[in-house]
């Protein structure tokens, strides 16, 4: 159930409030986003300061030097940073959300005791090294290899990693490499903890020039006959791909929180400009088209905020699977922020086009969000295909019955099966969306009807295309967008219910 909307316990809320205030104060005093963009570097003092206030180890267990906060509160902090400086947000995300996350989730007690305290304090920096020249969206196509040493004490790693945030400056890197497996000709992916002082580790480029997020150190690194002790294996041998995908779920959630913060900043500036700029004898805010842009931005920001914190709470609850939810919020938040920054610049007009305003930088920074942590097109296909698996299982039995009824006639089989799918879909009962407040009754009925309609269409699409649906990316994208919109609407509905009932969210 998506209700009630998650709330933090009072002590966690207070701790989060304090951390949010501390982070906001630090950002305003010490982080100059224009300077960071101009110099293409986040100064050491800023990084050290983030470590001192606890940002770089926020969710890490206190036993290992962290603050022990929830993912929910971590997202609150990342929202603040994301609304202030895109480069700093991506730096923190690369270090904490994915860089040391594999160690936090899959490391042994000995590994955590050895590696985690300096990482949590910010004395050392982390990076997550998955991407390669041939392994971008296709994460399983890793070509970096790790072969056992003759004495069995370690692995020899050879290969190259590219576009790794913090890659050239990190002290500890989680590196994905392909290890031998007799059952799999190409081998399986394993995660290793790697340090730059290992012989054979080479930083080819420490700071690659980029369109946006210019302050982060995006590097290219190479491994040549680099020996890594077997004690540095994270998780199980051959289970690195699952580890990587789990880590990216956390990164997508904080990505969405950063997008939420940036969207809030843009909306504040949109409103300020609309209330003060006059043309044709009235303020811009009196024109309907301007009002529409602000209203759309506010609605989408509220949706991304609601869904981000719902998903963060889902992760905190210990749920087994949240891959689809994290993919949905990442796609929605990054898509909408791109549109919001564009509309913000439009409202600011010619003045917004100059570099003394932050909007061109924010647009350049926002563009990465549609690519990083999983390209949006790929994630749309993923969202749809996960849905196909569930619905396809339901339809499998009907397919068998249809084959018996058709008695070998292929044309009749298709007709019978689609007819059965249509009848079954029409018989679906609208899901019950709880009505806790009278003001939401209309929206409850509407949401319930739309969810049921979507379920029917999913069944009909599968009945029509069958296995070929895996090649129908236009269909997949449309279904993924509908599913995402329904998820966003459900999160908003749940949150509004909580607000109307007790006014505390």
What are these regions (language model features)?
Residues 1-94, 101, 105-114, 118-125, ...:
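Amphipathic, small/basic residue-rich leader segments at the start of a protein or domain
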Residues 25-26, 54, 164, 213-214, ...:
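Alpha-helix capping/hinge segments and adjacent helical runs
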Residues 124-130, 201-206:
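Short Pro/Gly-enriched beta-strand edge/turn motifs at strand-loop
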Residues 134-137, 163-166, 182-183, 210-217:
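Short Gly/Pro-enriched turn/cap motifs at secondary-structure boundaries
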Residues 154, 158-203:
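A short core secondary-structure module
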Residues 203-302, 368-369, 385-391, 400-487:
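Glycine-rich beta->alpha junctions and the first turn(s) of the following alpha-helix
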Residues 275, 279, 302-332, 345-348, ...:
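C-terminal helix-coil-helix/basic helical segment that borders enzyme active sites and/or dimer interfaces
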